[in-house]
Design a protein with these regions (language model features):
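BZIP DNA-binding basic region
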Residues: 2-26, 33-70
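Short Cys/His-centered divalent metal-binding micro-motifs
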Residues: 66, 70, 95-98, 128-151
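A short, flexible N-terminal coil/short beta segment enriched in small residues
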Residues: 37, 83, 147
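Alpha-helical and His/Cys-centered functional microenvironments
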Residues: 14, 110, 143
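Histidine-centered nuclease catalytic patch
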Residues: 95-133
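Generic domain-boundary/flexible-linker signal
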Residues: 53, 101-104, 146-149
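Short cysteine-rich loop/turn motifs with clustered Cys
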Residues: 40-49, 75-108, 135-137
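Short, charged surface segments at domain edges that flank catalytic/cofactor-binding sites
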Residues: 26-34, 56-92, 120-125, 129
Length: 151
C-alpha cells in the first residue's frame, strides 16, 4: 500500500519528531548516542563491561543497565516488574487487582520533576522502589491528592 504524502500513516512514519521531554515530564531524556566508539563499553553508563575479570568486547550493555533502560523507557517492562513484585495486590487497600484493572503509580509523583532537565534530574523517580501497584479507585484518589499537594 503506497504512502500518500497527506495521509496519517505518512505523517506518523516520516513526520517531524518532536522532543517529548519539553512538555512531557514522564519520559526522561535519552542518552546522546546509542553507539559507542569501542565495543565492550556500556551504552548507558559508559563503563567497561567486565565479565569473569575479562573485558568483554562483544557486549554493549551491562545487564543491570539494560534492565534500568527498559524500565525507564518501556512502561510495559516496568508494569511487568511491579506486578510480579507486588503480586497483583493494591498497596493502598490490599485488594487483589485484575490483570487490566490496576495502575502503576509513582510513590513520589513525577509531576515534581516537571521542567527539571540535565544533571539536576533525579533518576530515583524512575526506579522500581518509587513504583507501586494501585487499583484504579485508589490511584484516582492518590492522583487527586498529589495534584492538590503540588498545586
Amino acid at each position: 500500500m503506497p504512502l500518500s504524502k497527506f495521509g496519517k500513516r505518512h505523517k506518523k512514519t516520516f513526520g517531524k519528531k518532536k522532543e517529548k521531554w519539553d512538555g512531557n515530564f514522564r519520559i526522561p531524556p535519552k542518552p546522546n548516542s546509542y553507539y559507542v566508539q569501542e565495543k565492550g563499553i556500556c551504552r548507558w553508563c559508559g563503563k567497561k563491561i567486565i565479565e569473569n575479570k575479562v573485558h568483554n568486547k562483544r557486549k554493549t550493555w551491562h545487564q543491570d543497565c539494560a534492565t534500568d533502560y527498559m524500565i525507564i523507557y518501556h512502561s510495559g517492562e516496568a508494569r511487568k516488574h511491579i506486578w510480579k513484585r507486588d503480586k497483583g495486590k493494591c498497596n493502598e487497600c490490599g485488594e487483589r487487582c485484575t490483570r487490566r484493572g490496576w495502575d502503576l503509580d509513582h510513590v513520589k509523583p513525577l509531576m515534581e520533576q516537571k521542567g527539571i532537565k540535565g544533571n539536576k534530574l533525579d533518576w530515583s523517580y524512575y526506579e522500581l522502589h518509587n513504583m507501586q501497584t494501585l487499583c484504579r479507585p485508589c490511584h484516582k484518589k492518590k492522583t487527586k491528592q498529589d495534584m492538590k499537594n503540588n498545586a
